[in-house]
Amino acid sequence: MSKLVEELKDEFDYIILDCPAGIEQGFKNAIAAADRALIVTTPEVSAIRDADRIIGLLEANDIHKIDLVINRIRMDMVERGDMLSKDDVLDILAVDLIGIVPDDENIVISTNQGEPLVGSNTPAGKAYQNICDRVMGKEVPFMEITGPTFFQRLAHVFKK
């Protein structure tokens, strides 16, 4: 894997390897060539535990540029105390935050339609674009993620 990545570096500015979450050989092969890591996790206790273990493995392999993406956060659940907040996750993992992606039904829709979501005018699409911009070194403010409004919840009830 390292040799392949070295060859690709001549052709591309960024090489992204999506590796398995576990500590098996596939993960070890992927991080062997890494100079940076983006940890993607959901704000659930078991996912945070896995992310913390992965961060430890990355640091043990001299990968210290580690950024975090919190995926599928739902502010209504955070406000009820049913989901960890952004601050809770950051306190536990102690790495830099590069993006927060709200839970968005458009993710499923775009995946099923084979359409990219990055750059679209959806909450998740905007969040993905912001992450891309931050990876490229741009200063982009974090989106404010809020729960559904009363009227959005009401509209959802009548859609059914």
Give the positions of each predicted feature.
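Short leucine-rich amphipathic alpha-helical surface patches
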Residues: 105, 111-115, 132-135, 139
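Conserved phosphate/pyrophosphate-binding and hydrolysis machinery centered on Walker-type P-loop NTPases
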Residues: 27, 117, 121, 144
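Short, well-ordered alpha-helical scaffold segments within catalytic/effector domains
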Residues: 1-2, 125
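Conserved catalytic-core segment of NTP-binding enzymes
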Residues: 2-109
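P-loop NTP-binding site
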Residues: 96, 126, 130-160
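C-terminal boundary of histidine-terminating zinc-finger modules
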Residues: 111-128
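Residue-identity detector for threonine
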Residues: 41-42, 111, 122, 146-149
